[in-house]
Amino acid sequence: MLLATFKLCAGSSYRHMRNMKGLRQQAVMAISQELNRRALGGPTPSTWINQVRRRSSLLGSRLEETLYSDQELAYLQQGEEAMQKALGILSNQEGWKKESQQDNGDKVMSKVVPDVGKVFRLEVVVDQPMERLYEELVERMEAMGEWNPNVKEIKVLQKIGKDTFITHELAAEAAGNLVGPRDFVSVRCAKRRGSTCVLAGMATDFGNMPEQKGVIRAEHGPTCMVLHPLAGSPSKTKLTWLLSIDLKGWLPKSIINQVLSQTQVDFANHLRKRLESHPASEARC
């Protein structure tokens, strides 16, 4: 695949390629994504994670009809990188330690990942079909502040293609105001591979959203949510949320760990209440 793509690029004259900016960008993207696929490939203990990681390389290996700018291509590649890194972390089952477990089975685990830091993993089962969760978490993303008190506001700043977004999120104070207001600028991508939906993201730069006065610019990533039907109960959804955040500022690690772990527990509770109180529309993952 990589050799064929390279021959395709080299077979055209320099002058011809110079006049086809869009094709050149897409060919470079195809080579880059194929390299990433080979570097990140390999067996994983989880079939659905392996399926997503393998098929997600199609984003770069297909020449899109839409012509993207250099910056848009960079955002697309960032989103792909976030997905690959996050799924790679989830696929490694070793080293996870239990932080908490609720009476309803909701479980938070954590581990330290080299070059990333401490990450948190929430595993829950929601009594709603996967399409309903996708609708709330992606299609109605900007409404999250209505039902999640840990989020004041989410705005989609730019949409790139069908499944990549640049977002600005303003988080509420936490831990009795010991953690002041934070905001995040992130690139997010949402994809479906077979019966699995993945929502991934990481911090990025966006010129039209500089740091705000009185708010600390924190950083996400890599992070992701994985949704798939519960085995044997397709009307229920298994949700796995990998959370990795650098809150910045001077905060004790004990406070950070407490805030992030509790954030995941609270999120699951608020999400269930939202799904129960608001009917589904026709959105599909």
UniProtKB/Swiss-Prot annotation:
Residue span of the annotated presequence: 1-63
Effect of E169K: In AH1; partial loss of activity
PTM-bearing positions, type Phosphoserine: S57, S195
Keywords: Congenital adrenal hyperplasia, Disease variant, Lipid transport, Lipid-binding, Mitochondrion, Phosphoprotein, Steroidogenesis, Transit peptide, Transport
SMART domains found in the cross-reference section: START
Localisation per UniProt entry: Mitochondrion
Record annotation: effect of changing E169G: In AH1; partial loss of activity
Any one GO molecular function term: cholesterol transfer activity
InterPro entries, per database record: StAR (IPR029866), StAR-like (IPR000799), START-like_dom_sf (IPR023393), START_lipid-bd_dom (IPR002913)
Tissue: Expressed in gonads, adrenal cortex and kidney.
Catalytic activity: cholesterol(in) = cholesterol(out)
Superkingdom of origin: Eukaryota
Gene Ontology cellular component annotations, sorted alphabetically: mitochondrial intermembrane space; mitochondrial matrix; mitochondrion
Residue intervals of the START domain: 67-280
Main location: mitochondrion
Biological pathway: Steroid metabolism; cholesterol metabolism
Entries under CDD domains matching the protein: START_STARD1-like
Disorder association: Adrenal hyperplasia 1: The most severe form of adrenal hyperplasia. It is a condition characterized by onset of profound adrenocortical insufficiency shortly after birth, hyperpigmentation reflecting increased production of pro-opiomelanocortin, elevated plasma renin activity as a consequence of reduced aldosterone synthesis, and male pseudohermaphroditism resulting from deficient fetal testicular testosterone synthesis. Affected individuals are phenotypic females irrespective of gonadal sex, and frequently die in infancy if mineralocorticoid and glucocorticoid replacement are not instituted.
Main function: Plays a key role in steroid hormone synthesis by enhancing the metabolism of cholesterol into pregnenolone. Mediates the transfer of cholesterol from the outer mitochondrial membrane to the inner mitochondrial membrane where it is cleaved to pregnenolone.
Complex formation: May interact with TSPO.
Name assigned to this protein: Steroidogenic acute regulatory protein, mitochondrial
